Amino acid sequence: MTRAAVRLGLAQGGLCFWEKGCMTEMSEPTIRLATPDDAPALLAIYEPYVRQTAITCEYEVPSVEEFAGRIERTLKRYPYLVMELDGRPVGYAYVSSLNSREAYDWSVETSIYLARDVRHGGLGRKLHDALKQCLIAMGITNMCALIAVPHDKDDEYLTHNSQDFHAHMGYRLVGAFDRCAQKFGRWYDMCWMELVLAERVPNQPKPTWFPDLLA
């Protein structure tokens, strides 16, 4: 996906995909860039993950103000995307730096959340693919995901679905941690999965931060 395609897609109110040499705009659902004003709607999606699952290791639901600040901080460097169905936000995806040290600039940690009433309908793939295309245009080489997984078998708080989803997206398992996170009084494993977006070469050009890509 070219930088011009990213700019045009977002300017037209929906992300565009680069397919078979031509740019085609998505029909419903639509994907757009988030703003801090989206915080209440996106927090409503996130809240059940905090209260009812071990998918996120966060214990307390952040305030709307804190969540808006997270969006704003992300957008200073990276894409933060919102998926809508009939004008209603039903999912969001963003990335953060894998590490604050400059040598890690080519690698990001990904996060993706869908409203629980629209999961398992293929929307996660579309949202992830849109995020991936933005990162490719930026010059990011590595998408990394830190995923909570059950230590033994699935339970009411956590399944292997997230790990399976990322495997279907092309990620490979690159690391695992034994019972390193506790939530709801239970211990869970964590795993790192990685998707390589571009060849890593000596003197790799620095990524273009997302706001500069849209300028």
Regions found by a protein language model. Name each.
Residues 30-42:
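A short beta-loop-alpha structural element at the N-terminal edge
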Residues 43-70:
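Conserved GNAT-fold acetyl-CoA-binding loop/helix
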Residues 61-117, 128, 134, 138, ...:
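Acetyl-CoA-dependent GNAT
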Residues 120-136, 160-164, 168:
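Conserved acetyl-CoA-binding loop-helix of GNAT-fold acetyltransferases
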Residues 135-158:
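Conserved GNAT acetyl-CoA-binding A-motif
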Residues 179-215:
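C-terminal "cap" of GNAT-fold acetyltransferases
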